[in-house]
Amino acid sequence: MSVREKMLEILEGIDIRFQEPXHSYSYTKVGGEADYLVFPRNRFELARVVKFANQENIPWMVLGNASNIIVRDGGIRGFVILCDKLNNVSVDGYTIEAEAGANLIETTRIALRHSLTGFEFACGIPGSVGGAVFMNAGAYGGEIAHILQSCKVLTKDGEIETLSAKDLAFGYRHSAIQESGAVVLSVKFALAPGTHQVIKQEMDRLTHLRELKQPLEYPSCGSXFKRPVGHFAXQLISEXGLKGYRIGGVEVSEKHAGFMINVADGTAKDYEDLIQSVIEKVKEHSGITLEREVRILGESLSVAKMYAGGFTPCKR
């Protein structure tokens, strides 16, 4: 029995799509095919997929809403798991519990409806709750670390554990999950009682700022660089004269230099080449080395063509 036949038998009932283009699920609108794109409906299906992948030695990864990710043009080998169907959100007093696939912006709106404050900073951050925890997403002085009470995860070995904020060792755009290989299942956020109108006014203000300053009208990978200590990445890029700088179909936004935008059917290679070129030019101009915030995943097109049969153990 081939691995694919075994997969269809053991993972029967789970939504698995073969050779699925990743660009349909990415904010960048680029990316090659995933060998197996999986949409588990609950944590039990997710655990089944992870267990099967581990047993068969098939690589796997979980993507949130792919808002701060570039999938290379050659695609991703193995399983790519999208958790957007794990999206339940509940409110208990001043606590919101959200599954990993819940939309982060919608979760902040649920907090607003219940007059809970503390989540306003995230009202315009695209992505999923799980992805936000993974990278300790933040904006306008707030971040996930400030409000996370606990986080339920599936370890890479298939065990379910509950972690505290301390366990997650949050840092700037970092959590311990990035090294552990665990998968976020659900998160509890500790908020505070507030006034609906005050919360709404703050969310409206932050949303307006984001619309004013960021190129939301174009596909992009979000904020491409982490903030260097004592500096702003966008300012360093602007000072080097790089606004409007373009490689292929991707260019540095004139509106916000920290964003690389897809203006003309750009490719993942265009994104990657532009980001690397910006890093080099900023280093040359200011002596400061920018660090990528966006994650780059998968294989280049040239590598994928060398192994046109896909992931070797998975005979199709």
Curated annotation (Swiss-Prot):
Key word Cell wall biogenesis/degradation present: yes
Key words of the record: Cell cycle, Cell division, Cell shape, Cell wall biogenesis/degradation, Cytoplasm, FAD, Flavoprotein, NADP, Oxidoreductase, Peptidoglycan synthesis
Any one GO CC term of the record: cytosol
Catalytic reaction equation(s): UDP-N-acetyl-alpha-D-muramate + NADP(+) = UDP-N-acetyl-3-O-(1-carboxyvinyl)-alpha-D-glucosamine + NADPH + H(+)
EC number(s) stated in the UniProt entry for this protein: 1.3.1.98
Cofactor(s) needed: FAD
Catalytic-site annotation from UniProt: 173, 223, 293
InterPro entries in UniProt: FAD-bd_PCMH, FAD-bd_PCMH-like_sf, FAD-bd_PCMH_sub1, FAD-bd_PCMH_sub2, MurB, MurB_C, MurB_C_sf, Oxid_FAD_bind_N
Gene3D superfamilies: 3.30.465.10, UDP-N-acetylenolpyruvoylglucosamine reductase, C-terminal domain (3.90.78.10), Uridine Diphospho-n-acetylenolpyruvylglucosamine Reductase, domain 2 (3.30.43.10)
Top-rank lineage group of the source organism: Bacteria
PROSITE patterns in alphabetical order: FAD_PCMH
Domain FAD-binding PCMH-type span(s) in chain numbering: 30-194
One Pfam family of this chain: MurB_C
Protein location: Cytoplasm
Similarity remark: Belongs to the MurB family.
HAMAP family for the chain: MurB
Protein name as catalogued: UDP-N-acetylenolpyruvoylglucosamine reductase
Gene: murB
